[in-house]
C-alpha cells in the first residue's frame, strides 16, 4: 500500500523520516550520503540508499519471521520503507563477534580475535558528545530506560546476533559486529528501529583471504578502499539468492 509523503520529521546522516496520513506510521527515505567518524568524513555514493533500504527490509523480515519485533512494515519503493512511528531510545547497542575497529584501537586486543562470548557495548547516541561508551553504572545513572528494559534489549540483541550469525554463515559471510537502535512503538513495546545494513554491520567474505578484499561494509569507505557499491551489492545479491533458493 502506498502512503502519501507528508512533512519532514527528521533528517539524519543517512535517512530522512517523513510523516504520512497514518499518525502512527512514517516513511523512511534512505539517502546516498556516506559518512564516517561522526560525519567528519562525508561523500555521496550513487545507489547506496537503494541497497541499504532493500538489505534492511530483507533482514527486518527475517527477524520478524523469528519473532523479533521491529519497526519495519513494508517497502514503499526501492529507497522508501514504511515503518511504525517510534520514540527512539538514544542508545546505540553494539555487539561484537570478532575484534576490529575501535575495540582494537582502544584496547590491546588483536585484530581478528574471536570474542566468545560476544562483547556487548552501549553508547550514548549524541554526535556532539561523540557517542560516548557507557559503563553499566553510567547507563543506569542516565535513567533512559528501566533495568528490566535494559535486560530486554540485551536479550533481543543477543538473539538477533545468533539469528544473523547463522544466516550469514550460510551465505559465506562472517558477521563481525553490528549496531542496533531501539525505540517504543505506539503500544509502548520495545522494537528494533533504524536499519540493518552494511552501514551499521561489518561483514567479511569467508571466500576471500585478503584482509582488505574480504571487507563488504562501510569500512571500505572509512579506509578509502573503494568498491563500496560493489561490496553492498554483493551482500544484497547473496541475500536475494538465498531468498530465491528458499522459495
From Swiss-Prot:
Any Pfam family: SAICAR_synt
Single GO MF annotation: ATP binding
Ligase listed as a keyword: yes
Pathway: Purine metabolism; IMP biosynthesis via de novo pathway; 5-amino-1-(5-phospho-D-ribosyl)imidazole-4-carboxamide from 5-amino-1-(5-phospho-D-ribosyl)imidazole-4-carboxylate: step 1/2
Superkingdom, taxonomy of origin: Bacteria
Keyword set includes Nucleotide-binding: yes
Family annotation (InterPro entries): SAICAR_synt/ADE2_N, SAICAR_synt_PurC, SAICAR_synth, SAICAR_synthetase, SAICAR_synthetase_CS
NCBIfam families noted in UniProt: purC
Protein name: Phosphoribosylaminoimidazole-succinocarboxamide synthase
UniProt source species: Prochlorococcus marinus (strain NATL1A)
Amino acid at each position: 500500500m502506498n502512503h502519501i509523503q507528508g512533512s519532514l520529521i527528521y533528517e539524519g546522516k543517512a535517512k530522512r523520516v517523513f510523516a504520512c496520513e497514518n499518525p502512527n506510521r512514517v516513511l523512511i527515505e534512505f539517502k546516498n550520503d556516506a559518512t564516517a567518524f561522526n560525519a567528519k568524513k562525508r561523500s555521496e555514493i550513487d545507489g547506496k540508499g537503494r541497497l541499504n533500504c532493500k538489505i534492511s527490509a530483507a533482514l527486518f523480515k527475517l527477524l520478524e519471521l523469528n519473532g523479533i519485533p521491529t519497526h519495519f512494515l513494508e517497502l514503499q519503493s526501492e529507497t522508501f520503507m514504511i515503518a511504525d512511528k517510534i520514540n527512539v531510545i538514544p542508545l546505540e547497542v553494539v555487539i561484537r563477534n570478532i575484534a576490529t575497529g575501535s575495540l582494537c584501537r582502544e584496547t590491546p586486543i588483536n585484530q581478528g580475535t574471536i570474542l566468545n562470548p560476544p562483547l556487548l557495548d552501549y553508547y550514548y547516541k549524541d554526535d556532539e558528545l561523540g557517542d560516548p561508551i557507557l559503563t553499566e553504572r553510567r547507563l543506569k545513572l542516565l535513567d533512559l530506560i528501566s533495568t528490566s528494559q535494559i535486560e530486554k534489549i540485551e536479550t533481543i540483541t543477543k538473539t538477533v546476533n545468533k539469528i544473523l550469525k547463522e544466516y550469514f554463515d550460510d551465505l559465506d559471510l562472517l558477521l563481525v559486529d553490528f549496531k542496533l537502535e531501539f525505540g517504543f512503538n505506539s503500544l509502548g513495546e520495545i522494537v528494533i528501529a533504524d536499519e540493518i545494513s552494511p552501514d551499521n554491520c561489518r561483514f567479511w567474505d569467508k571466500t576471500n583471504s585478503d584482509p582488505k578484499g574480504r571487507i563488504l561494509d562501510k569500512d571500505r569507505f572509512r579506509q578509502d578502499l573503494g568498491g563500496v557499491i560493489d561490496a553492498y551489492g554483493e551482500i544484497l545479491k547473496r541475500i536475494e539468492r538465498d531468498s530465491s533458493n528458499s522459495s
